[in-house]
A protein has these predicted regions:
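A short, N-terminal "cap"/entry segment at the start of jelly-roll beta-barrel domains
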Residues: 2-3, 27-122, 219-294, 298, ...
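Asparagine/serine/threonine-enriched low-complexity, disordered tracts
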Residues: 2-27
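A short beta-strand-loop-beta hairpin characteristic of the jelly-roll/cupin
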Residues: 132-169, 176-179, 184, 312, ...
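Short amphipathic alpha-helical linker/capping segments at the junctions of internal repeats
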Residues: 172, 214-219, 334-343, 352, ...
C-alpha cells in the first residue's frame, strides 16, 4: 500500500559530497575528536553511573553525542501512499463506522518511523477523511491547527468559528487552532474525500493538547457563505472592517482555479526555483506570512518534462499530487507518483522532483512545519553539490521496507540556499 526507503547506507553515502574531511585533514564528523564526548567506560565509572541512576540522574557525556548529533537524524522515512490503493479502503469505512461514533471518519497515514506519534513525517499528521452524502459532523475545537485539501467530491463544507465555507476538488482550507469547526457533505449523490493535515504530534510533544466538544454540538453559521473569501480573496485588503489581529490568516479557503491560474501566470513571468519549479506559498493576506503559526502550505508547478535540482532543508513536508504524474528522488530513493498520491520528505533529506509528462504540467500541493523552523531560527537549506545537482538513485523504484533512513552528513552549519 505504501513505499518506503530502506535503511541502507548505500542510499545516502554515495549521494552526497559530505566534505567530512576538512582542509586540515580532520574528519569533521568524528566522535573521537576533541570537542566531542569520548569518555571510555571503566569499572569505577560504571559504578558511578549506577549511583547517579539511583537518584534519577545521569552523566551527560554518556549520551551527549546522541542527543546533539552533527546533523539532523530524523526517525521518519521517505514514504509514498498511493491514492488508488487507499481509496477503496477509505470508502470501506463508510458502512463500517458511523461518523458520530468515530468523531471523524479518517484513515490516517502513518510513517513507519513515527508510529508511536501517529505522524506522517516529523511532527506532522495527515489522513484521508470521508463523508457520505448528506452527512454532518458535530463541532469541536482543539489546540492543534488543521488544514484540508479536497481530493474528490463536490458537496464538501466546513464551518469555522461560525463561518460556512464550501470547498471543491483541490481547494485548500484551514482550521486554525482554537477555532470551533464542523464538517459535512451536502451532496446527495457521492461521498467527499479530503486530506487532513494537523500539527497534533507537535502539540502533543509540547504537552499542550486541549480538546472541547461544542456545547450545542453544532454551530449556527452566519448568513454569508465563504465570507472570508469574499472579503480577503481579491488581493486587496478590505477597509471598514474590524482590524484583524489574530495570529492566523483571516482568509480561510483558497479555491483551486485561481490558485492554479496564479501558478500559470507566474510561470510566464519568472523561471522559478531550480529546486521547486514555479512555487508559491498560500499566505496570510494581512501579514504576507504563513497561513498559520505552526504550518505553512505551498503550491508548485513543474513545467512539462522539467526536472528540478536536489536540495535539502530543516523542516518536514507532506506532498499531495494535485495534477499530473512524475517522480521524486528522496534520500537516493525514487518514488513515482500520479494525481492523488501523497508522499513525504523528512527534515534534512535530499529531494528533487521531475514531471514525466512531456506535454502537460504537474502540480504539487504541500504543507510543512517551516513556520516553526523559522520562528525558532532553526531553518537551514543547502543545494546538492554534486552530479549537476542530481542524486544517484540507489534503486529504480522504492521498495516497501519499513526501516528508518540514516540521513547523510554534510556541512554541519549550512548557509541557506535559495529560500523556498
Amino acid at each position: 500500500m505504501n513505499d518506503h526507503s530502506v535503511n541502507d547506507h548505500s542510499v545516502n553515502d554515495h549521494s552526497v559530497n559530505d566534505h567530512s574531511v576538512n582542509d586540515h585533514g580532520v574528519n569533521d564528523y568524528d566522535d573521537t575528536r576533541a570537542g566531542r564526548a569520548r569518555v571510555s567506560d571503566t569499572p569505577e565509572l560504571k559504578a558511578y553511573y549506577e549511583e547517579l541512576g539511583a537518584l534519577q540522574a545521569g552523566a551527560l557525556w554518556t549520551v551527549a553525542n546522541e542527543i546533539e548529533p552533527w546533523y539532523p537524524q530524523p526517525k521518519s522515512v521517505p514514504t509514498l501512499w498511493r491514492y488508488q490503493e487507499l481509496r477503496p479502503l477509505v470508502h470501506k469505512a463508510l458502512p463500517l463506522v458511523r461518523a458520530d461514533d468515530a468523531g471523524r471518519r479518517v484513515v490516517m497515514l502513518v510513517n513507519p518511523g513515527r508510529k508511536e506519534l501517529s505522524a506522517a513525517v516529523g511532527l506532522l499528521y495527515t489522513g484521508l477523511q470521508i463523508m457520505g452524502p448528506g452527512e454532518a459532523m458535530t463541532a469541536h475545537r482543539h489546540q492543534a491547527a488543521a488544514l484540508r485539501f479536497v481530493q474528490e467530491g463536490t458537496g464538501a463544507w466546513t464551518v469555522v468559528d461560525g463561518q460556512k465555507l464550501k470547498v471543491g476538488p483541490r481547494d485548500f482550507a484551514i482550521t486554525p487552532n482554537g477555532t470551533w469547526h464542523e464538517h459535512g457533505n451536502e451532496s446527495t449523490e457521492a461521498p467527499v474525500i479530503w486530506q487532513d493535515g494537523l500539527d497534533i504530534p507537535l502539540v502533543n510533544a509540547l504537552d499542550a493538547g486541549f480538546y472541547e466538544v461544542h456545547p450545542e454540538l453544532y454551530q449556527r453559521p452566519g448568513a454569508v457563505v465563504n465570507s472570508s473569501v469574499l472579503s480577503y480573496g481579491g488581493n486587496l485588503l478590505p477597509h471598514g472592517m474590524e482590524k484583524w489581529t489574530r495570529p492566523y490568516s483571516p482568509l480561510l479557503a483558497w479555491p483551486w482555479e485561481p490558485s492554479y491560474q496564479a501558478l500559470l501566470d507566474l510561470a510566464k513571468a519568472a523561471e522559478g526555483s531550480p529546486y521547486d519549479g514555479v512555487i508559491m506559498e498560500y499566505t496570510n493576506p494581512v501579514t504576507g506570512g504563513s497561513v498559520m503559526p505552526t504550518m505553512g502550505a505551498h503550491l508548485q508547478l513543474l513545467r512539462a518534462g522539467q526536472a528540478t535540482r536536489a536540495h535539502r532543508h530543516t523542516g518536514s513536508v507532506v506532498y499531495t499530487v494535485a495534477k499530473g504524474r512524475g517522480r521524486s528522488v528522496i534520500a537516493g530513493q525514487r518514488f513515482d507518483w500520479q494525481q492523488g498520491d501523497i508522499f513525504c520528505v523528512p527534515s534534512w533529506a535530499w529531494h528533487e522532483h521531475a514531471n514525466l509528462d512531456e506535454r502537460e504540467d504537474a502540480v504539487l500541493f504541500s504543507f510543512n512545519d517551516f513556520p516553526v523552523m523559522r520562528s525558532l531560527a532553526f531553518h537551514r537549506e543547502e543545494a546538492y553539490p554534486d552530479h549537476d545537482g542530481h542524486q544517484p538513485v540507489a534503486h529504480p523504484i522504492a521498495q516497501p521496507v519499513a526501516h528508518p533512513v540514516t540521513q547523510p552528513a554534510a556541512h554541519p552549519i549550512a548557509q541557506p540556499a535559495e529560500e523556498r
